[in-house]
C-alpha cells in the first residue's frame, strides 16, 4: 500500500497542515536545507496529524560534496560538513563522525524512521561505496524501527541495465545481514531546455521502474522522493511512500539544485488532469472550452468548478492542493487492487 508524503520546501505556510487535514497526504519529508531542525520538530509537535511514524527528516547530506554556497540552512544542522572530499570519507575525518553522531542522536527516540545520510551518485565509484558504508554503520550502531538508505542517483545511470544490476548486487551483498532495510530514492535528472519538466525518455523510465521493482522483491521498504505524475507508476509497484511537493522543484529533482543559479520566470496556473495524466495550463483549458468538452479533463477535485469556470477564481495554493488531492484519489484506487494487471487496466480506463 502506497502513501503520499508532502515533500517539504520553502514557503510552506499552512500547506502541509491543510493537506493532512483534508486527508490528501499521510506524512511529510522535511528539508533541513529549508528549515532548522528545532523549528521542524516544534512544528511536528504542534500538528496533530504528524507523528514519529509519518515524519521523516531528510539530512540532505548529498549536498556535502558540492559548493558550500548551495547548502542554505544545512550549515546550521548538526555541524554539517562542507565540501566533503573522498579523503574525508576514506580517513573517516573527525568532522564526518561528529556530524553523523549529532544527526542520529537528535533523531533517536523522536522518530521511528531514519533516512540514513547518503551521497549524490553519478557513477559506481567512491560516493556509491561510502553511501553503502554509512548505511551499514547506522544499521549496526543506531536504534530505529526502519532504516532508509538515501540514494540520489543520476538519471544517466539508468541508461544502462548492467549498471543497475551491479548496483543491486552491491546493495544486496552489503545489506542482507540486516532486517528493516529501506531505500529513500531520489532521481537526479539532467537540466533540460524542454519546457515539459515531466519529460523522461522511455529507456530511463523503464530502468528506474526495474530498479524499484527489484528492490521490492528483496523486501526493501521504498520511499521515492521528488516525484511528479510518475508517482502513479511507483504506486503501481507498491512503493511504501512517494514524496511530492508544492513547487515544480519539489516534484522533480534536477542537477540545477547542485549549482548556484537564480531561476526566474512567470509561474503559470496548472491543473493536474487525471484523464490526461499530465498538467494543463488553466489558460489552455479556457481556450479549449470553445470547441471541446472540458469536463472530460476533470480529476474530480474540490476546486474543479472554480478552476474551470474562471481562472481568477483559483489560487496557486488551491492548485497545489488539487494536485495532491487528485494524486491521492488515484493512489487510493490503485491500493485497492491486488495485481499489476488490474492496476494497468485501471490506468488505461482513466485515460481512455
What are these regions (language model features)?
Residues 2-169, 180-181, 189:
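Active-site beta->alpha loop and helix N-cap motifs at the rims of alpha/beta catalytic domains
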Residues 295-352:
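C-terminal extensions of enzymes
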Residues 262-306:
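C-terminal amphipathic alpha-helical segment
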Residues 254-276, 343-352:
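C-terminal helical cap(s) of enzyme catalytic domains, especially alpha/beta-barrels
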Residues 48-49, 216, 235:
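Anion (oxyanion) recognition and catalysis
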Residues 27-36, 113-119, 229-232, 236-259:
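Glycine-rich phosphate-binding active-site loops on the catalytic face of alpha/beta enzymes
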Residues 216-231:
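Glycine-rich adenosine-cofactor-binding loop
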Residues 167-209, 236-237, 251-267:
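Glycine/Thr-rich beta-alpha phosphate-binding loop at enzyme active sites
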Amino acid at each position: 500500500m502506497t502513501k503520499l508524503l508532502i515533500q517539504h520546501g520553502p514557503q510552506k505556510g499552512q500547506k502541509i497542515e491543510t493537506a493532512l487535514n483534508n486527508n490528501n497526504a499521510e506524512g511529510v519529508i522535511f528539508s533541513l536545507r529549508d528549515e532548522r531542525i528545532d523549528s521542524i520538530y516544534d512544528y511536528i509537535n504542534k500538528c496533530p496529524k504528524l507523528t514519529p511514524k509519518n515524519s521523516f527528516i531528510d539530512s540532505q547530506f548529498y549536498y556535502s560534496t558540492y559548493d558550500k554556497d548551495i547548502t542554505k540552512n544545512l550549515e546550521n544542522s548538526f555541524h554539517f560538513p562542507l565540501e566533503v572530499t573522498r579523503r574525508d570519507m576514506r580517513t573517516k575525518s573527525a568532522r564526518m563522525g561528529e556530524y553523523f553522531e549529532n544527526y542520529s542522536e537528535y533523531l533517536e527516540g523522536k522518530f521511528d524512521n531514519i533516512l540514513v545520510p547518503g551521497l549524490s551518485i553519478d557513477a559506481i565509484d567512491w560516493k556509491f561505496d561510502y553511501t553503502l558504508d554509512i548505511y551499514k554503520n547506522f544499521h549496526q550502531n543506531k536504534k530505529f524501527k526502519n532504516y532508509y538508505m538515501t540514494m540520489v542517483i543520476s538519471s544517466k545511470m539508468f541508461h544502462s541495465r548492467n549498471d543497475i544490476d551491479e548496483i543491486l548486487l552491491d546493495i544486496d551483498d552489503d545489506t542482507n545481514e540486516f532486517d528493516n532495510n529501506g531505500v529513500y530514492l531520489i532521481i537526479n535528472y539532467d537540466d533540460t531546455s524542454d519546457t515539459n519538466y515531466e519529460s523522461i525518455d522511455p529507456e530511463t523510465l523503464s530502468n528506474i521502474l526495474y530498479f524499484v521493482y527489484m528492490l521490492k522483491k528483496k523486501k526493501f521498504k521504498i520511499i521515492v522522493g521528488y516525484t511528479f505524475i510518475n508517482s502513479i507508476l511507483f504506486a503501481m509497484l507498491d512503493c511504501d511512500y512517494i514524496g511530492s511537493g508544492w513547487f515544480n522543484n519539489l516534484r522533480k529533482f534536477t542537477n540545477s539544485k547542485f549549482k548556484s543559479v537564480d531561476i526566474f520566470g512567470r509561474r503559470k496556473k496548472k491543473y493536474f488532469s487525471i484523464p490526461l495524466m499530465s498538467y494543463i495550463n488553466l489558460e489552455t483549458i479556457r481556450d479549449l472550452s470553445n470547441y471541446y468538452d472540458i469536463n472530460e479533463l476533470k480529476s474530480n477535485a474540490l476546486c474543479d468548478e472554480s478552476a474551470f469556470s474562471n481562472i481568477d477564481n483559483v489560487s496557486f495554493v488551491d492548485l497545489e492542493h488539487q494536485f495532491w488531492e487528485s494524486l491521492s484519489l488515484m493512489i487510493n484506487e490503485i491500493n485497492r487492487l491486488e495485481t499489476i494487471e488490474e492496476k494497468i487496466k485501471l490506468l488505461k480506463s482513466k485515460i481512455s
